């Protein structure tokens, strides 16, 4: 009898432990799979593609790759003598037409004062027409001069904002064409995180909710706030034909993968380029307030650690 009782006790204890372990694992798994978090997140920043508005030989490159520059700092300079000559020519044209316009204005004024008593109406009208033509030519010359001045100013390529020069691929002596991207500028203090959340987890994501960001390979946890949720993503199963009609994929997959929706997260503290744009991170949405780590249960802490490994 005593042996039977002992066996039953052992069996009951084992069964209870198995049930408790199953409950703990189940709760951890539910929390792990259904709570709003993702390992598919990336640091991003505002990037300006810098391209010259004029063409010519590069005479000087004033920065080096990955350099931190200030707004209006010179990045590189394009051959200026040619544009200076163009400006001088345009200014000479303006001066010529200014003198010519003054002469024609005086002549037209003189003929208008004399009137039809001294000359024919045709001669008076002709003088006025010549004056208007010269004035139009003067206006055109002034516009050409202003454009030449603008081109000369734009031979000096400056940084549009504070930031880091990256992917610098221009060198002194190269010929660069108008509109060709020469360098990218990553704006300082513009870093944010794009977290690609599965659609099944969007119920727990709202603008204003707090977020924890853990960069890949780091134990440091950054804080942030959900700024916005994308209003739409591309529908890969629907396209348009040549007439604009919808074309729907007739194949229905047995396993439906949850779509990922971009969620923009604003960082509380800018980390400069400590984590460059494009690097990955794990993001956890904690709700309206930051998570109190001291109140986390064991299985919740375990779930947080599991996130770092998949």
UniProtKB/Swiss-Prot annotation:
Cellular component, GO annotation: plasma membrane
Transmembrane annotation, as ranges: 12-32
Gene that produces this protein: aaeA
SUPFAM superfamilies cross-referenced by the UniProt entry: HlyD-like secretion proteins
Membrane topology label: Single-pass membrane protein
Entry GO MF terms: transmembrane transporter activity
Key word Disulfide bond present: no
First-listed, main subcellular location of the protein, grouped into a coarse class: membrane
UniProt record similarity statement: Belongs to the membrane fusion protein (MFP) (TC 8.A.1) family.
Keyword list, A-Z: Cell inner membrane, Cell membrane, Membrane, Transmembrane, Transmembrane helix, Transport
Protein name: p-hydroxybenzoic acid efflux pump subunit AaeA
Function: Forms an efflux pump with AaeB.
Localisation: Cell inner membrane
Gene3D superfamilies for the chain: 2.40.30.170, 2.40.50.100
């Amino acid at each position: 009898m005593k042996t039977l009782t002992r066996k039953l006790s052992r069996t009951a204890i084992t069964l209870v432990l198995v049930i408790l372990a199953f409950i703990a694992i189940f709760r951890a798994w539910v929390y792990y799979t259904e709570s709003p978090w993702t390992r598919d997140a990336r640091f991003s920043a505002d990037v300006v593609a810098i391209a010259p508005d004029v063409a010519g030989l590069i005479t000087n490159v004033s920065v080096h790759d990955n350099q931190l520059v200030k707004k209006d700092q010179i990045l590189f300079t394009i051959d200026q003598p040619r544009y200076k000559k163009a400006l001088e020519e345009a200014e000479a044209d303006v001066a010529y037409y200014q003198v010519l316009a003054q002469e024609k204005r005086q002549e037209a004024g003189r003929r208008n004062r004399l009137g039809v008593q001294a000359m024919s109406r045709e001669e008076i009208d002709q003088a006025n027409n010549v004056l208007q033509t010269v004035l139009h030519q003067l206006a055109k010359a002034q516009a050409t001069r202003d454009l030449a001045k603008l081109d000369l100013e734009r031979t000096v390529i400056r940084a549009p904002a504070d930031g880091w020069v990256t992917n610098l691929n221009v060198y002194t002596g190269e010929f660069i064409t108008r509109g060709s991207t020469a360098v990218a500028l990553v704006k300082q203090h513009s870093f944010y995180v794009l977290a690609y959340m599965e659609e099944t987890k969007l119920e727990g994501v709202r603008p204003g909710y707090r977020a924890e960001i853990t960069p890949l390979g780091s134990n440091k946890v950054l804080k942030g706030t959900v700024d916005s949720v994308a209003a739409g993503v591309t529908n890969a199963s629907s396209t348009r034909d040549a007439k604009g009609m919808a074309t729907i994929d007739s194949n229905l997959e047995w396993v439906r993968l949850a779509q990922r929706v971009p969620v923009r997260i604003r960082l509380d503290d800018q980390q400069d380029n400590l984590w460059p744009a494009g690097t990955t991170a794990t993001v956890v949405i904690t709700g309206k307030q930051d998570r109190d780590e001291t109140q986390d249960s064991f299985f919740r802490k375990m779930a947080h650690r599991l996130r770092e490994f998949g």
